[in-house]
From Swiss-Prot:
The lineage of its organism: Eukaryota, Metazoa, Chordata, Craniata, Vertebrata. Keywords: Acetylation, Lipid metabolism, Metal-binding, Mitochondrion, Oxidoreductase, Potassium, Transit peptide. PANTHER family: 2-OXOISOVALERATE DEHYDROGENASE SUBUNIT BETA, MITOCHONDRIAL (PTHR42980:SF1), 2-OXOISOVALERATE DEHYDROGENASE SUBUNIT BETA-RELATED (PTHR42980). It is found in: Mitochondrion matrix. The modification N6-acetyllysine is found at K232, K241. GO terms for molecular function: 3-methyl-2-oxobutanoate dehydrogenase (2-methylpropanoyl-transferring) activity; metal ion binding. Its EC number is 1.2.4.4. Heterotetramer of 2 alpha/BCKDHA and 2 beta chains/BCKDHB that forms the branched-chain alpha-keto acid decarboxylase (E1) component of the BCKD complex. The branched-chain alpha-ketoacid dehydrogenase is a large complex composed of three major building blocks E1, E2 and E3. It is organized around E2, a 24-meric cubic core composed of DBT, to which are associated 6 to 12 copies of E1, and approximately 6 copies of the dehydrogenase E3, a DLD dimer. InterPro entries: THDP-binding, Transketo_C/PFOR_II, Transketolase-like_Pyr-bd, Transketolase_C. Pfam families: Transket_pyr, Transketolase_C. Together with BCKDHA forms the heterotetrameric E1 subunit of the mitochondrial branched-chain alpha-ketoacid dehydrogenase (BCKD) complex. The BCKD complex catalyzes the multi-step oxidative decarboxylation of alpha-ketoacids derived from the branched-chain amino-acids valine, leucine and isoleucine producing CO2 and acyl-CoA which is subsequently utilized to produce energy. The E1 subunit catalyzes the first step with the decarboxylation of the alpha-ketoacid forming an enzyme-product intermediate. This is 2-oxoisovalerate dehydrogenase subunit beta, mitochondrial. Its cofactor is thiamine diphosphate.
Length: 392
């Protein structure tokens, strides 16, 4: 009883700390005030710090898909889900709190529009959410499951790796759950700490039978998500949550598709190939501009977009041209997907390399809270690695 009383007292103290304290279960989820967070307890004299480590660079307005509308990334996701529910009467969306719109508001308004039988809440049980989605998909319906944070996808690991990914193979294609798509907010957010900032894509890159996708912008998010939902394989769609409100650009209102497993060369160059996905794409775009301005170095920038299966041909073709490769991601260095890219390029392009391949990634530590600015692979770390490659 003493332990229970002590725990209750601890909770009350946290609650008394207010909305900016650790009382919030969803630490780091409240983005409505933007990415400028107070240094908190120092009153009016408190300094404010900019935690966003990048500048979002919108793509040119698309003209081939009809009418466009200004959307941020979460609105683009909502638009894709709306299009899917309207087009496919079997499509259902489910997960923790999705009925009222979700933590990040990605499903707001969909329950009112399509009804509680098609957009509904589930218990807080990630293994159950994915298992339920597999069952729905096996019947031929379209299942769109939401895991509230990518950090909490691990309880569902067995269902994804041993069930969803292998269902078609173990039945000789008599049964499949290819109409399952799992959405999840992903990556650092500026103040998410240990359990709301992780980038677990590499865990699933070792799992044949599924596809893993990470967009960099609202336009990319809608097109790639629609492609995942319509794909014949189970897909995991990781959404960079720091971009939910920070990324704004023109997005087509009508549905459209962006091919999976096809990287995009955002900027052509001749001296160095820079590869990233998600938020980190905007970091390396800044690095490319710095390299051109300060060093006179021409960088080719590639957004990988699909982690599994990834576009080997586009990356290797670029490295054969430039002779140098830098890969960057937020996840820890050891065992990160940059290692797979580096290994493949080493095998395919060895005689073309002018310098060792460089990986600029997160540290091999749990994701820190107040030290997040030191943890993330920002433009200065990437620029330093690029300069060393050029001088090799």
């Amino acid at each position: 009883m003493a332990a229970v009383a002590a725990f209750a007292g601890w909770l009350l103290r946290l609650r008394a700390a207010g909305a900016d304290g650790p009382w919030r279960r969803l630490c780091g989820a409240g983005l409505s005030r933007g990415f400028l967070q107070s240094a908190s307890a120092y009153g009016a004299a408190a300094q404010r710090r900019q935690v966003a480590h990048f500048t979002f660079q919108p793509d040119p307005e698309p003209v081939e898909y009809g009418q466009t509308q200004k959307m941020n990334l979460f609105q683009a996701v909502t638009s894709a889900l709306d299009n899917s529910l309207a087009k496919d009467p079997t499509a259902v969306i489910f997960g923790e709190d999705v009925a009222f719109g979700g933590v990040f508001r990605c499903t707001v308004g969909l329950r009112d529009k399509y009804g509680k039988d098609r957009v509904f809440n589930t218990p807080l049980c990630e293994q159950g959410i994915v298992g339920f989605g597999i069952g729905i998909a096996v019947t031929g319906a379209t299942a769109i499951a939401e895991i509230q944070f990518a950090d909490y996808i691990f309880p569902a690991f067995d269902q994804i790796v041993n069930e969803a990914a292998k269902y078609r193979y173990r039945s000789g294609d008599l049964f499949n759950c290819g109409s399952l798509t799992i959405r999840s907010p992903w990556g650092c957010v500026g103040h998410g700490a240990l359990y709301h900032s992780q980038s677990p894509e590499a865990f699933f890159a070792h799992c044949p039978g599924i596809k893993v996708v990470v967009p960099r912008s609202p336009f990319q998010a809608k097109g790639l998500l629609l492609s995942c939902i319509e794909d014949k394989n189970p897909c995991i769609f990781f959404e960079p949550k720091i971009l939910y409100r920070a990324a704004v650009e023109q997005v087509p209102v009508e549905p459209y598709n962006i091919p999976l497993s096809q990287a995009e060369v955002i900027q052509e160059g001749s001296d160095v190939t820079l590869v990233a996905w998600g938020t980190q794409v905007h970091v390396i775009r800044e690095v490319a501009a710095m390299a051109q301005e300060k060093l006179g170095v021409s960088c080719e920038v590639i957004d990988l977009r699909t982690i599994l299966p990834w576009d080997v041909d586009t990356v290797c073709k670029s490295v054969i041209k430039t002779g140098r490769l830098l890969v960057s991601h937020e996840a820890p260095l050891t065992g990160g997907f940059a290692s797979e890219i580096s290994s493949t390029v080493q095998e395919e392009c060895f005689l073309n390399l002018e310098a060792p391949i460089s990986r600029v990634c997160g540290y091999d530590t749990p994701f820190p809270h107040i030290f997040e600015p030191f943890y993330i692979p920002d433009k200065w770390k990437c620029y330093d690695a690029l300069r060393k490659m050029i001088n090799y």
